[in-house]
């Protein structure tokens, strides 16, 4: 469950890779802080352990703003607040009362459990990152392994690793996911450019050993230019087929997660099917031929899938990485003609697309390689 304002969004598909919370007191009103919820046993009569559960909160940033865990007094939460679970992060109001500080939950901002996500408005690339396991500041985001992020103009959603690795290990080729953030603030551009060179490049180098279909929608122009420059330098020309305009179009990202359970398999008139899946890296479209589908019908299925994918992108407000697995050996020249029509269709709805690479037979290897790493 993800709480954005008063709206609850289901992002349970991200629970397998842990939780990262990004928050900062500087962006919050005076007296507000971020708190960590821990489970404790209370004491009953005669000092015996009570069977009733109590929940305490440990503010990660104090009202003085000195740093994490400098205000670690545990506070008992009662009443309806008991819906909280161990590991939750909450937004709290910290009120000075003489030599003590009282902590109150801010209604409507109960955030997450240890396997959930949280969104705080108004964040920038300079904000603090907290892990529910460590609760410490991570410098420059560079210690984070398997970080996948999505960002709107005023909100950010992050998923993170089960464990942290030191920077020197993260810089090696052990990365299992693309690392990408959508950030519009100027402060984030230089960081993301360097991150592309350090982290995305080694992953791309391994992936682009095979022809690969990757559609990138909804990213910052400067970041996209940086990745394109790297591709021209490092990626074999045979793996780069089509280059189209970059984009700066943002949709409601929470539709991405809710759409993952809506019509996952779409029948095609040609007799094939298209399976849609939301993975840790983005959306994947798997076009299947079905039983007894002839070669000519396979070509029709691939062409039909192009327009079906365009329809799904518009319907589900997709952005980010979109991976497409076509059927068998197809005519790439004919496919390119269809792709031009496809991009024109999406651009009519304010989408701008960059197609990094398109191929008929290389994507399956990439998807299987990624899944085998994540299992």
Swiss-Prot record:
The keyword ATP-binding does not apply. Binds 1 Mg(2+) ion per subunit. GO terms for biological process: mRNA processing; rRNA processing. It is found in: Plastid, Chloroplast stroma. InterPro entries: RNA-bd_AU-1/RNase_E/G (IPR019307), RNase_E/G (IPR004659). Involved in intercistronic processing of primary transcripts from chloroplast operons. The endonucleolytic activity of the enzyme depends on the number of phosphates at the 5' end, is inhibited by structured RNA, and preferentially cleaves A/U-rich sequences. This is Ribonuclease E/G-like protein. The lineage of its organism: Eukaryota, Viridiplantae, Chlorophyta, Nephroselmidophyceae, Nephroselmidales.
């Amino acid at each position: 469950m993800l709480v954005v304002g008063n709206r609850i969004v289901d992002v349970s598909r991200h629970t397998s890779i842990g939780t990262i919370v990004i928050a900062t007191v500087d962006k919050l009103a005076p007296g507000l802080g971020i708190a960590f919820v821990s489970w404790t046993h209370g004491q009953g009569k005669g000092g015996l352990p009570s069977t009733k559960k109590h929940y305490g909160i440990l503010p990660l940033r104090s009202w003085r703003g000195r740093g994490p865990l400098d205000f670690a007094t545990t506070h008992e939460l009662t009443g309806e607040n008991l819906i909280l679970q161990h590991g939750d992060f909450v937004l709290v109001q910290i009120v000075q009362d003489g030599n003590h500080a009282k902590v109150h939950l801010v209604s409507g901002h109960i955030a997450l459990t240890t396997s959930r996500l949280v969104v705080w408005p108004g964040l920038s690339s300079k904000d603090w990152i907290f892990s529910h396991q460590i609760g410490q500041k991570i410098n420059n985001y560079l210690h984070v392994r398997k970080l996948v992020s999505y960002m709107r103009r005023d909100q950010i959603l992050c998923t993170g690793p089960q464990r942290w690795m030191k920077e020197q290990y993260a810089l090696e080729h052990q990365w299992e996911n693309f690392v990408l953030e959508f950030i519009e603030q100027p402060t984030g551009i230089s960081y993301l450019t360097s991150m592309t060179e350090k982290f995305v490049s080694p992953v791309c180098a391994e992936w682009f050993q095979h022809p690969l279909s990757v559609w990138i929608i909804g990213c910052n122009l400067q970041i996209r230019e940086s990745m394109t420059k790297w591709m021209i330098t490092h990626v074999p020309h045979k793996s780069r087929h089509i280059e189209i305009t970059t984009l700066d179009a943002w949709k409601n990202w929470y539709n991405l997660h809710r759409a993952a359970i809506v019509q996952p398999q779409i029948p095609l008139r040609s007799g094939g099917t298209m399976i849609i899946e939301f993975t840790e890296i983005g959306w994947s479209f798997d076009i299947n031929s079905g039983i007894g589908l002839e070669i000519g019908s396979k070509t029709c299925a691939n062409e039909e899938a192009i327009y079906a994918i365009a329809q799904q992108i518009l319907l589900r407000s997709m952005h980010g990485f979109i991976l497409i697995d076509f059927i068998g050996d197809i005519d790439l020249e004919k496919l390119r003609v269809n792709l031009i029509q496809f991009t024109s269709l999406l651009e009519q709805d304010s989408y701008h697309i960059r197609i990094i690479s398109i191929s008929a037979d290389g994507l399956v290897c990439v998807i299987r390689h990624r899944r085998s790493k994540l299992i």
